[in-house]
Amino acid sequence: MSPTTRRLGRLFGLLAAASIVVTACGAASAPALTDPKEIVTAAVRTGQSAKSVHVDATLDGSIKADLSGTGAAGAAISLTGTTAAADIDLTAGNAHATFAVPALLGLSGEAIQIGDTTYFKTSLTGDKFQSQKGSDSLPVNPGDSKSVVDSINEALSQPGVDPVKGDDVACGSTQCYTVKIELTPSEINALDGGNPLASQLPVDLGSASLNLTIRVEKSTTRLAGIAATVAMGDQGSVTFDLTFSKWDEAVSISAPPADQVQTGS
């Protein structure tokens, strides 16, 4: 995987890390913030006691992927209408997610993470879950907020990463700050020291630009959403939107029954 791909993944990963340490806070409204970096880091700092969260995702656009490995982009693959939803138990480190990609042969699937075990099935693999042992699903310890804040601050201090406070917007029944980050292909490549390598992915991210908008509730400074557009020139573009809700509501996530898990995998 190229450094450019890793940097994009790291940026998204850090923002995702921020999302899982943000909590619903019942205290009085926070003072108004004007600095975009303070808005993002404030959202992280409110997350020291988060117990659970629900995430909804939508994905639209199309890409031309080199699925044959020949180096030539293939036909456009539509991602329009793709959706996903997840409940995350931050205390136990468990998660339950579902997804659907209607434009890709009606693909759908379900994943359950219990500790270091992942159970996964799709409409192409049959009715039973396959299980796999691995590392814990959550990329950070929700209680280690200082580490996450430091990582976010480091990411926001990189050359070319210049967050800008946008207009406040409605978020359901409340108001949200918006923080915008725009990165050109050259700025993304500069994050890798200007030495991008050939990507091992079927899509070359070396020419990708990124437009990112982070939504943070004004009254609680908790993360409300992340929207991003990744433009890849002739290879297409993808837009996704994540919304976060049901903070600290009761959630029960358990492994599937044994008779629903494929044996010998």
Model-based region annotation:
Residues 9-19:
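Sec-dependent signal peptide hydrophobic core
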Residues 2-5, 9-10, 25-265:
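Subset-of-secretome marker
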